[in-house]
Every structure is written in structure tokens, then in C-alpha cells.
């Protein structure tokens, strides 16, 4: 979840260092993070050198930083449960999928029916591993 925030923003900032992204139940829009404890907001704000108030309007949410990742040609695989109430699929990964594809980016998604926020990954992680290996770019 929060790792998706940091991983995506790393890719947007340093695209030459990223061959592919694996996002699992990613928090991609800080404004729509209903299941997240407000105490964690302070930590996220501190990591970005912002106040909690400034965090709500700053362009640090991955959904505001899609263009550099698409331009770099970084493929993404995302996994999410369709019953996640901590980081809702419809407000995060589903929005990224629509916007990323509309911008010309490659994104594959695996939806876990009936699954909530945890456990992360898949019982059989082979589809994730295969995607990463298929899109691994040693030159990056």
C-alpha cells in the first residue's frame, strides 16, 4: 500500500533506474485513503518534507505523476483485492489502470475476488515473477 506510493514516485523521479513496477494494493491517491490512520499521514508528510496540511494539495500522489512513468516506458503489474477498504481498488489501482492505458502505458492487473487489503501478493506469485522477468531491462 504505502510502498506503492514510494515505488511509483521513485519511478517518476528516477525513471532510468526502473525496469518495471509491481504494485500490490497501492495507495496512489493520498486524498482518498479512508482506511489509513491519520498518524501515518505525519510520517508520509515528513518523508516528503511537507506539513500534513500541505500534503493534501501537493503533487506527490502517484496519480498526479503518471506522465514521466509512461514516457519512460515503464511497464506495471498491479494486484489488488476487490474488497479492499483500506486502499479501495476503485479509487487507486483502477484509476491508475485507466489513466496509464489512456496515456499509452503498459499495465497488467490481477484482481483478487473477495480479498481485502491483506494478505499481499498471490498464493502463487508466478504471474508477478513472469511479468517482471519478461520486462526486465538490464540496461536500466
Tell what function each PLM region has:
Residues 9-19:
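Conserved hydrolase catalytic core segment
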Residues 77-80, 84:
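Short beta-strand/loop motif that positions the catalytic acidic residue
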Residues 1-9:
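Glycine-rich nucleophile elbow surrounding the catalytic serine of serine-hydrolase chemistry
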Residues 4, 28-29, 117:
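Active-site micro-motifs of SAM-dependent methyltransferase domains
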Residues 19, 26-68:
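Mobile cap/lid helix-loop segments that gate and shape the active-site cleft of serine hydrolases
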Residues 69-76:
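Short, proline-enriched alpha-helix->beta-strand connector loops that line the catalytic pocket
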Residues 24-25, 79, 112:
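Alpha/beta-hydrolase-fold catalytic nucleophile elbow
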Residues 86, 91-140:
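C-terminal catalytic histidine-bearing segment of alpha/beta-hydrolase fold enzymes
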Amino acid at each position: 500500500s504505502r510502498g506503492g506510493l514510494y515505488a511509483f514516485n521513485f519511478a517518476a523521479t528516477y525513471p532510468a533506474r526502473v525496469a518495471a513496477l509491481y504494485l500490490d494494493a497501492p495507495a496512489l491517491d493520498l486524498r482518498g485513503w479512508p482506511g489509513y490512520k491519520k498518524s501515518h499521514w505525519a510520517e508520509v508528510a515528513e518523508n516528503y518534507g511537507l506539513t500534513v496540511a500541505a500534503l493534501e494539495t501537493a503533487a506527490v500522489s502517484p496519480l498526479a505523476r503518471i506522465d514521466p512513468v509512461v514516457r519512460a516506458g515503464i511497464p506495471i503489474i498491479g494486484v489488488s483485492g476487490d474488497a479492499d477498504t483500506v486502499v479501495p481498488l476503485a479509487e487507486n489501482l483502477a484509476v491508475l489502470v485507466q489513466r496509464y492505458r489512456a496515456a499509452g502505458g503498459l499495465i497488467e492487473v490481477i484482481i483478487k475476488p473477495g480479498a481485502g487489503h491483506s494478505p499481499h501478493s498471490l498464493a502463487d506469485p508466478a504471474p508477478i515473477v513472469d511479468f517482471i522477468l519478461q520486462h526486465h531491462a538490464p540496461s536500466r
